[in-house]
Design a protein with these regions (language model features):
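Transmembrane alpha-helices and adjacent helix-loop boundaries
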Residues: 1-262
Length: 262
């Protein structure tokens, strides 16, 4: 059986990029042995736990936003390809509105439209800003997932539908047993790319008061009050987002090659 050469892409990366490995190793050695001599690096080490907690907040928001957006997007995408116009029209309106709305506007909208507390029975439950940001990011995520889902369905050759109908399969059986398994493989690369974009979009959360990585970096910069530290800490913020999103991008490229002719 032939083996797809693209499957070995992640394993062959170190052999094809020795220069990058040397550069990363040199940078790591500089941080380990040279950083403690500098007060700027010492301050960065002191703030590192707080930065890690803040970045954890960004990751939590991104995971919840893509989860909610994916579930809602699959439902909207299924409605968008429905033969009934009464269900297809609202789904397409949703997709067009939230795909073309600025994310910052949606975040401000959800922040100020939803209350600070929810009254359930005799209890008041806090409705924190980070949850509102999650909803604000889940809305465009759902529209993009719906469009990805619709595009994946449209990429399935029509001959498969015709062959299935000739075997007396119902539309529901064709959809569940034949179309959906192929769709999910085709959806995976763009879905992962969308998640990386959502993760970078969580940087907007600090604008509405969420204590995330950006907000922590701002507090640290104002507290230490050194120009070199300000440059270093925002470079560290950039490095954290890059270190989290770049592997997702590489895996996405690998999956695109893997399923290119599936």
């Amino acid at each position: 059986m032939a083996i797809d050469s693209s499957a070995s892409l992640p394993l062959s990366w170190p052999r094809r990029h020795p220069g990058k490995l040397v550069l990363l190793a040199a940078l790591a050695l500089l941080l380990i042995f040279g950083a403690p001599k500098s007060p700027v690096f010492a301050a960065l080490y002191e703030w590192s736990p707080a930065l890690a907690v803040g970045f954890g907040q960004n990751i939590l928001i991104s995971l919840l936003a893509i989860a909610i957006g994916s579930l809602l997007g699959l439902l909207i995408g299924a409605l968008a390809v429905s033969p009934l116009w009464i269900t297809r029209l609202p789904a397409r309106i949703w997709v067009q509105v939230f795909r073309n709305a600025p994310w910052l506007v949606l975040i401000y909208f959800t922040t100020y439209v939803f209350p600070f507390e929810l009254h359930i029975g005799k209890s008041w439950i806090a409705f924190p800003d980070w949850v509102k940001v999650t909803i604000g990011l889940a809305s465009p995520a759902s529209a993009n997932v719906a469009e990805i889902f619709r595009g994946a369905i449209g990429s399935i050759p029509s001959t498969q539908w015709e062959a299935s109908r000739s075997l007396a399969f119902t539309r529901g059986q064709i959809f569940r047993s034949i179309i959906l398994p192929q769709c999910f493989k085709r959806m995976l690369p763009p879905w992962m790319n969308l998640y990386a974009v959502i993760t970078m979009g969580t940087a907007l959360a600090s604008l509405v008061g969420v204590h995330d990585l950006i907000d922590t970096a701002q507090i640290a910069s104002n507290t230490v009050n050194l120009t070199g530290f300000t440059v270093l800490i925002y470079f560290s913020v950039l490095a954290l987002f890059f270190a989290y999103c770049y592997p997702i991008s590489r895996i996405t490229q690998f999956l695109e090659r893997r399923y290119a002719f599936s």
